[in-house]
A protein has these predicted regions:
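Active-site loops and adjacent core secondary-structure elements that bind or stabilize anionic groups
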Residues: 1
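Asp-based, Mg2+/Mn2+-dependent phosphohydrolase catalytic module
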Residues: 4-26, 33-211
Length: 211
């Protein structure tokens, strides 16, 4: 069901010489599809997203539409254009249920650069409509609940490792899950000092964890 996008991440990890099985890879698509199937079965979706994201939801049995949707779902859309924005804003203003995939503001690229991620697109739409989506990805409670249920692990047996305070580390905030911030990405020690979100551990990079 989610194999195509899931495989994209698995392939990326393999290039980094990290072997992982498909059942070990969980992405926000999994969380969103499971939740929407459980609570909004049969609803029509307008997806602001890439063809790959739309394919994932079509394969999962959802009805996608360009007109009169019940739900607007905002993804990390590298094919975003004005027509998509216009439609999304119109449907959201008209009262559609509104969800977002992930709250990340920026997506890191090779060479240390960043491009706008789903969270930035959500803020753009909020500026026009006054509405902000409920997200499925970190730090959403849906993500942590999904991980616990799918792995069968207890919260105290889980460690969340990431480079973003407001998503990766925040998802573990207020729980028994251990949070580990790596400084090899978006957040810095200065960000930690200024933030109310505090990781349990701070490391320079992943190599410090596996020593």
């Amino acid at each position: 069901m989610y194999k195509r996008q899931q495989q994209t991440y698995i392939d990326k990890l393999e290039k980094m010489e990290i072997e992982i099985k498909p059942e070990q890879m969980m992405i926000s698509n999994h969380v969103a599809i499971k939740y929407l199937k459980e609570y909004y079965e049969g609803k029509r979706l307008y997806i602001v997203g890439t063809p790959l994201l739309k394919h994932e939801f079509e394969t999962a049995g959802f009805v996608l539409t360009e007109e009169d949707p019940d739900i607007v779902l905002l993804g990390f859309d590298t094919t975003l254009n004005y027509e998509k924005l216009k439609k999304a804003c119109q449907y959201i203003r008209n009262g559609c249920i509104y969800f977002g995939m992930n709250e990340d503001l920026n997506c890191p690229m090779e060479g240390g650069t960043f491009i706008p991620d789903c969270g930035s697109m959500a803020r753009l739409i909020e500026a026009s409509t006054g509405r902000f989506p409920e997200f499925f990805g970190k730090p959403s409670k849906y993500t942590l609940d999904y991980i616990i249920k799918e792995t069968g692990c207890k919260p105290e047996e889980i460690a969340i490792v990431g480079d973003r305070l407001y998503t990766d580390i925040a998802v573990a905030d207020g729980s028994e899950v251990t949070s580990i911030l790596v400084l090899s990405g978006e957040s810095s020690r200065e960000d930690v000092e200024k933030s109310d979100i505090k990781p349990d551990y701070i490391v320079k990079d992943l190599s410090e964890i596996i020593r």
